[in-house]
Amino acid sequence: MHTPLIDLRGIRKSYGGGDSPRVNVLRGIDLSIHAGEFVAIVGASGSGKSTLMNILGCLDRPTSGEYLFAGENVAELGGDELAWLRREAFGFVFQGYHLIPSGSAQENVEMPAIYAGTPAAERHARAAALLDRLGLASRTGNRPHQLSGGQQQRVSIARALMNGGHIILADEPTGALDSHSGAEVMTLLDELASQGHVVILITHDREVAARANRVIEISDGLVISDTARDLSTPRSANPAALQAVDLRKRLSEGSGSHGAWKGELLDAIQAAWRVMWVNRFRTALTLLGIVIGVASVVVMLAVGEGSKRQVMAQMSSFGSNIIYLNGKAPNPRAPKGVITLEEVAALGELPEVKMIMPVNGGQAGVRFGNVDHSSYVGGNDTHFPAIFNWPVAEGSYFSEADEQGAAAVAVIGYKVRQKLFGDRIDPIGQYILIENVPFQVVGVLQEKGATSGDLDSDNRIAIPYSSASIRLFGSQDPEYITIATRDANNVKQAEAAIRTLLQRLHNGKQDYELTNNAAMIQAEARTQNTLSLMLGSIAAISLLVGGIGVMNIMLMTVRERTREIGIRMATGARQRDILRQFLTEAVMLSVVGGLAGIVLALAMGAALLASKVAVAFTLSAVIGAFACALVTGVIFGFMPARKAARLDPVAALTSE
């Protein structure tokens, strides 16, 4: 006697309990089915026949009793092994067809083979052959809504046969069809049974049940009759059908086989893209949050980096070997210290000092014709262009003779030139009024640009130190001293030498302070970095909001596609397959949104550059923003994906 392929012993199934009343749906089912049988299970609505089919197809577990499949106790099988059985042993044909709306007929048929890890070319060919065999060769690209009821049911039969369909579980396969389409479906099931497939037909129609060679009637969860009839033509088991002996080996091998992970991932990506395209309006709205978030982060960081580079370049252009010396009050009650010209001369003798220049200046009103302007006026000596690496663009700098004679000459900055003279008037030789004192313009400095905040280096006027002291400010003592060291790498040593000399000259009083350009550049860099971080953090909030939007949409998608999840599980999807599918969709949303956000950011950057705004895109910022979008997709997509993977197959299939 051969071991039954399916052997049920005392199977019971009940629902409820606890605070709700317990409902006994199956109350002790004993049933054996051998390879090659065509069995019809008949019963009225509510008799338990659909619950029995779910248990037979490993979609549900009994409350008690023993279910042996090819001698293996199904209760001892894990989730992956049950999925393998649904994928390799069973093929489901449902009354409601249960096709995935977003997929074509070909894609619906291929689904079990995807979860089996079948190579793409092989499954494409097999699906096409099955559809051709069932008369749907011209409908392979049609979606379910483009097919009639009979055609949809034939697609579901082809899907059931995709991985062999050794056991066909047909739940009311003709219930939603007209008589002609129903007859066609039953003819197909007859053919499958004659070819050796086990066909288990669930129906309430006794005429349909009469097509089977064995009719089992259940009522109120019990088998009340089991009738077999002789066949005029004996059915022989298909050599390819599952046999109890080889199933044990195939089950242990197959449940551990996951297929090629690259192929599975590619299939998940293709399915995700298909879903996104079908629901493209919703997809676009969901992407908007990610796009705006990524674009905001990239543009904000680019603006911050551009501003930083601009400021750093301008500050560095003045030289990193510059030291500034000015007097200060040693304590709140003491007067501010004064650096005299005699001390300037003494400092100039130090071997570490290359050049030294006293500066006497301040903000002053400037006029040319009827144009008034406010500018910084600095009394310098002839070392100014060399110390600051700031050549003259037009005319010439004032001479040593001008300094000695306190000449009323001026070299103006680029911004002063534009404000007073514009582009039409040549400023060289023109007279301007500085605090109502006439000065002749002898030169125009090259454009430097703003360094930080409101400080604009081009909004200045250089005049001889002697002229500033005598004609404008009335003081011989400098406002501060500018010192250029011989070696930019030894600024600290130069500072130490200057301090030592000043300590001696000032009798130990700390009524002065030293700052150097390098330290100022570093401080400004830290400020700019902090500003960039703040801008990026503000922009990142929009990316976070976009991620929450992805999670909300995915949670709604899981609810809307609950039946699809049940279909995938019925065709052999494991929990991790469902998890991967929905997580891939979330990540795909983030990837597409991230790429679109980068493109938008580059376009916005180009517009800002055209508007003369300093922008500097960095690869790290672009990659970082894209990576954040990707991580956002994983984090906010995981919870919906996990929820989808944990759905009960039966509950998912019966959801509306």
UniProtKB/Swiss-Prot annotation:
One of its GO terms (cellular component) is plasma membrane. Pfam families: ABC_tran, FtsX, MacB_PCD. It is found in: Cell inner membrane. PROSITE patterns: ABC_TRANSPORTER_1, ABC_TRANSPORTER_2, MACB. Coiled coil: none annotated. Its EC number is 7.6.2.-. The chain crosses the membrane at residues 284-304, 538-558, 589-609, 619-639. The keyword Transport applies. The keyword Transferase does not apply. Residues 6-245 form the ABC transporter domain. Gene3D superfamilies: P-loop containing nucleotide triphosphate hydrolases. It is an enzyme of class 7 (translocase). Keywords: ATP-binding, Cell inner membrane, Cell membrane, Membrane, Nucleotide-binding, Translocase, Transmembrane, Transmembrane helix, Transport. It is a multi-pass membrane protein. Its main location: membrane. Part of the tripartite efflux system PvdRT-OpmQ required for the secretion into the extracellular milieu of the siderophore pyoverdine (PVD), which is involved in iron acquisition. This subunit binds PVD and drives its secretion by hydrolyzing ATP. The system is responsible for export of newly synthesized PVD after the final steps of biosynthesis have taken place in the periplasm. Belongs to the ABC transporter superfamily. Macrolide exporter (TC 3.A.1.122) family. This is Pyoverdine export ATP-binding/permease protein PvdT. It comes from Pseudomonas syringae pv. tomato (strain ATCC BAA-871 / DC3000).
